[in-house]
Amino acid sequence: MPLNPILAAVLAQRTEVSAPPMHEGSPEAARTMYRAMNAGYTREAVTRVRDEDADGVPVRVYHPNPGVVLPALVYFHGGGWVIGDLETHDHICRKLANAVPCVVIAVDYRLAPEHPFPTPLDDCYTALNWVTQNATQLGIISGKIAVGGDSAGGNLSAAISLKARDENGPAICHQLLMYPVTDASFDTPSYADNAEGYLLTTDGMKWFWHHYIGDEVDPAQAYVSPLRASNLSNLPPTTVITAEFDPLRDEGESFAKLLAQAGTSVSMRRYDGMVHGFFAMADLLEAAQEVFEFSAYQLAASFKTA
């Protein structure tokens, strides 16, 4: 399927701007650029939004109906572990909270390269534990807590599910993985076919990985590359979303297949004509709105059976 015409126009517009790509600048410059890119999206009203401290990790709690105890989604933002924060994904969290409906807890984990692996993962796990331990005070139904995230946030979600299983940690009833990073290698056909020209580039991913794990961390260990985990059994039901024109497409789909082979209930959808990051563009793209509706359906279904 050809590239979506709206996305083609967006990409052409960005090509006309002479600014260098993120990976040619500093992490600080990339963060500023990313905040600007995400500043204009519509932010839905949510009844109660509060910033909290989750045992030292900043989080933002979105509760669409504070008078009702609801399930929860602990959300880890994307941005290659280097960029992104509570503001860049605020519109996504608001929309998910209203659509499911559920309480959404967005996690402002520390970023690489100042805080490389495993610090972002540890922050996310700390936040998940805090949510579990404080469910009653947060208006959350204990035992109905999911994790999710986009891109690097999908990587963190998958790693958190593995870690929680390995350490007999918090029970996770679902993982929602939006075009997740699952492998620290660059040898798939989607990396070759979509190396540049579709927002996320192969060189950009190499830059992100370098800042996250450097040269001393084994890139094949499970909490870095969940696709390489030797044991993918006993993991929560999973939803995986991929995009046709995305370097990460193949590793996301391979992860979904391996999870299914290990006995996990998996629902995987590829959105043709889309690029990495399209989930954030519900203001522009019908497909992004469809993903929100599908994600809300998947989460609600898991919450009912948890």
Predicted feature residues:
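Short amphipathic alpha-helix adjacent to the substrate-entry channel of hydrolases
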Residues: 87-106
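Catalytic active-site module of serine/aspartate enzymes centered on a nucleophile-bearing elbow/loop
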Residues: 284-306
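Hydrolase active-site cap/lid region
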Residues: 162-217
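Short beta-strand element of the alpha/beta-hydrolase
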Residues: 69-79
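Short beta-strand/loop motif that positions the catalytic acidic residue
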Residues: 240-242
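Gly/Ser-rich "nucleophile elbow"/oxyanion-hole loop immediately N-terminal to the catalytic nucleophile
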Residues: 132-147, 167
